Regions:
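A structural signal for alpha-helix termini and helix-coil/disorder junctions
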Residues: 5-9, 50-54, 76, 163, ...
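Charged, glycine-rich intrinsically disordered N-terminal tails and low-complexity linkers that flank
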Residues: 1-43
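Metal-dependent nuclease catalytic regions and adjoining charged, substrate-binding loops involved
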Residues: 143-204
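Charged, low-complexity, helix/coiled-coil-prone segments
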Residues: 3-19, 94-105, 140-141
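N-terminal start-of-chain detector that recognizes signal peptides
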Residues: 19-22, 72-79, 145-148
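Catalytic cores of nuclease domains that cleave nucleic-acid phosphodiester backbones
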Residues: 26-139
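Secondary-structure junction/capping motif
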Residues: 1, 60-64, 143-145
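Glycine-rich, flexible loop segments associated with nucleotide phosphate handling
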Residues: 23, 27-29, 139-150
Length: 204
């Protein structure tokens, strides 16, 4: 189904990967692209983590555009100080087993001691609340776009962090970087902790 729509829609980001190819060749092309993007995202995250932990940034030469945008982002987060990178969070079910888990990219503290979550996204796409959702909705009739999906992700992280530490999260935001962007984008997420709490209760 997806392959057919990608082939006829020249504006789709997968169109060039599948048009004129057999299903097998098209799937192979798409998987190769997805894997490459995943690896680039992982490499970028590692560069940011190493920089924040005062370690040598081994792949900095391969991520010059991303690192440049990252420095601009960090400079713009005035009053926030990095506290912890790559922090695992989880919530247990009734049996005490981890039912939901995630990893906070960066935890920051403000001048009053409040804690904030920052999540890195390597994408040139629209991460605004009004981004196109192709007529799809979820939760309380919210557009099912990347902004709201990532907002739910970070709301879950915020709740799990509070469950683990007893400390509330003041805010969550996305730091969006990509070589195709003219500049870094810092996107405040939508607070979906009410929906996230319902999901955690359902999982527990």
């Amino acid at each position: 189904k997806n392959l057919a729509s990608w082939r006829v829609n020249a504006s789709n980001k997968h169109h060039a990967l599948v048009v004129g190819l057999s299903d097998e060749e098209a799937i192979k092309n798409v998987m190769k692209s997805w894997n490459a993007n995943r690896d680039l995202g992982t490499g970028m995250h590692k560069c940011f983590e190493q920089y924040l932990n005062d370690e040598p940034v081994a792949q900095e030469a391969n991520f010059q555009a991303e690192m440049s945008q990252f420095h601009v982002a960090m400079d713009s987060l005035v009053g926030l100080t990095p506290v912890r990178t790559e922090m695992s969070v989880f919530a247990n079910d009734a049996k005490g087993d981890a039912a939901v888990a995630g990893q906070i990219d960066l935890l920051m503290r403000d001048s009053e001691g409040g804690l904030h979550i920052v999540d890195y996204k390597r994408t040139p796409g629209d991460l605004s609340p009004n981004a196109h959702a192709f007529g799809k909705f979820f939760l309380d009739d919210l557009p099912l776009n990347d902004h709201h999906k990532y907002s739910l992700q970070l709301s879950l992280y915020a709740l799990m962090f509070e469950l683990q530490t007893g400390q509330p999260i003041v805010s969550t935001r996305l730091v969006q970087v990509h070589p195709d962007l003219d500049e870094v984008r810092i996107v405040p997420t939508t607070d979906l902790r009410g929906d996230a709490r319902n999901l955690l209760e359902g999982a527990g």
